[in-house]
Design a protein with these regions (language model features):
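Gly/Thr-rich phosphate-binding loop signature of adenosyl cofactor/nucleotide-binding cores
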Residues: 1-85
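Charged, amphipathic alpha-helical linker segments immediately N-terminal to NTP-binding catalytic cores
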Residues: 88-127
Length: 127
């Protein structure tokens, strides 16, 4: 028999003491169905084959530096952000106190995807 995993995002935010960067988005009914998380480096580069979109997505220092470079090409950036957020991901967590960009806020709110933050390092948060 398959184990079923389900937790409300609201509970995860509380338990992990996450900062909600998108308070306009209602997190009370968003469910997390996977215990595993995903670092979306390949997706942010535009490769979406075998994307684990049902997992919590975490952006650390490496992804953040790449996103800063990506935002120099507005057309490519918007295309990647549209694909990423339109895939129905449950949320994105930024580690190390990293702040999402204005462009990411806009697209995340468009697709109702919460952006969250933690002061913890990526590996520490993932453990």
């Amino acid at each position: 028999m398959e184990n079923v995993y389900e937790v409300k995002l609201e509970k995860l935010i509380e338990k992990m003491e996450l900062v909600n960067y998108t308070p306009k988005i209602d997190v009370s009914e968003i469910l997390i169905h996977q215990a595993e998380i995903n670092r979306p480096a390949l997706q942010l580069a535009g490769f979406f084959d075998h994307f684990a979109e049902n997992r919590v997505q975490i952006i650390g220092r490496v992804e953040h530096v790449y996103l800063q470079q990506l935002e120099q090409d507005k057309i490519q950036m918007l295309d990647v952000y549209e694909q990423f957020f339109n895939s129905k991901i449950p949320c994105v967590v930024f580690s190390r106190g990293i702040q999402p960009s204005e462009a990411m806020f806009y697209i995340a709110e468009k697709y109702n995807v919460p952006l969250l933050g933690t002061p913890l390092g990526t590996s520490e948060f993932m453990a």
